[in-house]
């Protein structure tokens, strides 16, 4: 029986490349001359720390980072940015977390979405991924389109497609 897995992963090497590209752009931009503005990727925590001298500049840096992530194939919705920025001395910073895996609440929404579609497929939650099995490949492709079209707050990838 054909099956595939729904996952939500961020390639850390691509994220590192995007952070490096964003750093290069900030170094060459006129409005950031003489300003302390940095990006730091923490592989262990899967976070990106954005630091600058004002909250407005932190927002600008986040926009640059999102653009560079998108260019490297990582959607902006995979970046979880807190609403409040931290003010410490003369600097402002924010730690944006890269979303890895699918949370259980989102998993339940996906399974409910698939079951409500009345397609002849079964969805099973397996850890941080969802296995979808069905008799026809067309039904599985319909499920892929359904999950992509649903506004669930994070990007999804499909892997382990088996016939």
UniProtKB/Swiss-Prot annotation:
PANTHER family with a match to the protein in the record: UPF0234 PROTEIN YAJQ (PTHR30476:SF0)
Function (record text): Nucleotide-binding protein.
GO molecular function, one term: nucleotide binding
Any single Gene Ontology cellular-component annotation: cytosol
Entry's family note: Belongs to the YajQ family.
Keyword terms of this UniProt record: Nucleotide-binding
Transmembrane annotation, as ranges: none
Native source species: Citrobacter koseri (strain ATCC BAA-895 / CDC 4225-83 / SGSC4696)
NCBIfam families, alphabetized: PRK05412.1 (NF003819)
Protein name per its UniProtKB record: Nucleotide-binding protein CKO_02735
Keyword 4Fe-4S: no
Keyword Ribonucleoprotein appears in the UniProt entry: no
SUPFAM superfamilies linked: YajQ-like
Pfam name, any one: DUF520
């Amino acid at each position: 029986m054909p099956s595939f897995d729904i996952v939500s992963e961020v390639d850390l090497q691509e994220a590192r490349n995007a952070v490096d590209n964003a750093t290069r752009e900030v170094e060459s931009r006129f409005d950031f001359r003489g300003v302390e503005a940095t990006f730091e990727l923490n592989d262990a925590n899967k976070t990106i720390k954005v630091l600058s001298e004002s909250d407005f500049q932190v927002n600008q840096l986040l926009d640059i980072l999102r653009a560079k992530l998108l260019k490297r194939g990582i959607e902006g919705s995979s970046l979880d940015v807190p609403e409040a920025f931290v003010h410490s001395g003369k600097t402002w910073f924010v730690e944006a977390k890269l979303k890895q895996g699918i949370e259980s609440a989102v998993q339940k929404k996906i399974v409910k979405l698939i079951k409500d579609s009345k397609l002849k497929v079964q969805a099973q939650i397996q850890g941080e991924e969802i296995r979808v099995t069905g008799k026809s490949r067309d039904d599985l492709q319909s499920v892929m389109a359904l999950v992509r079209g649903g506004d669930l707050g994070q990007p999804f990838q499909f892997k382990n497609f088996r016939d």
